[in-house]
Amino acid sequence: MSDLYPFENNFLELNGLNYHYLDEGQGDPVVMVHGNPSWSFYYRNLAKALRDDFRVIVPDHIGCGLSEKPGDEDYSFSFKQRVDDLDALLEHLEVRERITLVVHDWGGMIGMAYASRYPERIARLVILNTAAFHLPPGKKFPLALKICRDTAIGTFLVHKLNMFALMAARVGCKRNPMSEALRGAYCAPYDTVSDRLATLRFVQDIPLKPGDRGYDLISEVEDGLDRFADLPMTICWGMKDFVFDKHFLKEWQRRFPNAEVHAFADCGHYILEDASDEVIPIIEQFLAANPLDAPLEKSAAASPDENA
């Protein structure tokens, strides 16, 4: 694993639990927030590419990656708690500069909820197949997720058989399917029943209607997104993602019409794996074109890549 993940491991004791994070390089902070059933491994290539010029901070959510895997008696596994954890980590690391926020999957909800608490701390946004709002118009909640979220058989498949992580690793890349070694690395933190409770709780915590835990918080985040309309933003999107599909991309574009958009027609959910050789240079160029010492201006709008 060390050849694929060549980083120093750091831990913060948070409410009695070990919270793992990467803290690489120096310079303007870039904070990368992963989703489910992923972990900081997803950002490894981007972290390596940026750490010579930036301070790269990448946490593993509690219950994920190399962080501790508690039971329900020791952790709430709630959306709000995830935001509180990220808040505590950045406070612990004394991050006082404005940050670049990179988000994927659940990381969009968590990261943008943090941003909503401290809008003045956010300098640039990198959006990767994610959301920070309720289901967009025209999008139905996928049946496979509904089964995992709401049924006993779904609980069995996700928790007992690890099918959520296993299938995500198999279908998350379309252009460049993951090798066996990569699939193994993505699933390694969740190799026992006790280690994969977070993958189940994340799915069960998806708020779909008023009264669901976290629904009001997502509503607050959604309602405050216009505060970030003038920030530099780049969006890299795998169009073959069956969850975060064209409807979600269209909603990002509606809310942020000045964002750069790079759509990849042949790529899936794990866009940093599927099109790493294109997406990482795009992000590097975006950061170079929008330095933090320059006045904040709207990003030039761009159409999806012609070759996507």
Q: Where are the regions that the model predicts?
A:
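Conserved HGGG/HGGXW glycine-rich cap/lid loop of the alpha/beta-hydrolase fold
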Residues: L22-K69
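Conserved hydrolase catalytic core segment
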Residues: E97-K139
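Active-site loop/oxyanion-hole signature of alpha/beta-hydrolase fold enzymes
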Residues: L14-N15, L22, V58-V103, P281
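Catalytic active-site module of serine/aspartate enzymes centered on a nucleophile-bearing elbow/loop
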Residues: A259-A308
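The conserved beta1-alpha1 loop
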Residues: V33-G35, H104, W237
